[in-house]
């Protein structure tokens, strides 16, 4: 659960930063006090919220690493790629589009995550078989 919370937070942070950066002047102009009137306070607020979401995401990620094997936990981070792509292409204010190549790529990512993380109920793992084999020796 902590890993999925981390994924949700990092995905929302990515979307928030993208939304904000499309509404702010270029970073080179940020320190120019003459252009301070061009800065939207809502965009700054969303950037601050996004940075907070990243920090919270890291906290939840650390909690996830305490309980999950790294191979499973790390693969779950890939869900954020699929989530960000889908939301950016779905929400109208991002002006992103679905393409065949991106959709195929995201589908492969999701299939990989499912392959790694779904446990097969009917077939035991190799480790289980090894323990069972040693018990009968």
UniProtKB/Swiss-Prot annotation:
Belongs to the ArnF family. GO terms for cellular component: plasma membrane. Keywords: Cell inner membrane, Cell membrane, Lipid A biosynthesis, Lipid biosynthesis, Lipid metabolism, Lipopolysaccharide biosynthesis, Membrane, Transmembrane, Transmembrane helix, Transport. It is found in: Cell inner membrane. GO terms for biological process: lipid A biosynthetic process; lipopolysaccharide biosynthetic process. The chain crosses the membrane at residues 43-63, 74-94, 98-118. Heterodimer of ArnE and ArnF. Translocates 4-amino-4-deoxy-L-arabinose-phosphoundecaprenol (alpha-L-Ara4N-phosphoundecaprenol) from the cytoplasmic to the periplasmic side of the inner membrane. One of its GO terms (molecular function) is carbohydrate derivative transmembrane transporter activity. SUPFAM superfamilies: Multidrug resistance efflux transporter EmrE (SSF103481). Pathway: Bacterial outer membrane biogenesis; lipopolysaccharide biosynthesis. Its main location: membrane. It is a multi-pass membrane protein. It comes from the Bacteria. This is Probable 4-amino-4-deoxy-L-arabinose-phosphoundecaprenol flippase subunit ArnF. Coiled coil: none annotated.
């Amino acid at each position: 659960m902590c890993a999925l919370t981390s994924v949700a937070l990092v995905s929302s942070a990515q979307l928030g930063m993208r939304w904000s950066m499309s509404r702010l002047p270029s970073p080179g102009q940020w320190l120019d006090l003459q252009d301070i009137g061009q800065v939207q306070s809502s965009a700054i607020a969303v950037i601050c919220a996004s940075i907070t979401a990243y920090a919270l995401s890291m906290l939840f990620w650390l909690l996830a690493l305490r309980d999950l094997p790294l191979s499973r936990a790390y693969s779950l981070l890939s869900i954020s790629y699929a989530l960000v792509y889908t939301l950016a292409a779905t929400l109208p204010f991002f002006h992103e589009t679905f393409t065949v190549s991106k959709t195929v790529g995201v589908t492969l990512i999701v299939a990989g995550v499912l392959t790694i993380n779904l446990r097969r109920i009917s077939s035991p793992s190799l480790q289980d078989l090894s323990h069972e084999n040693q018990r009968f020796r």
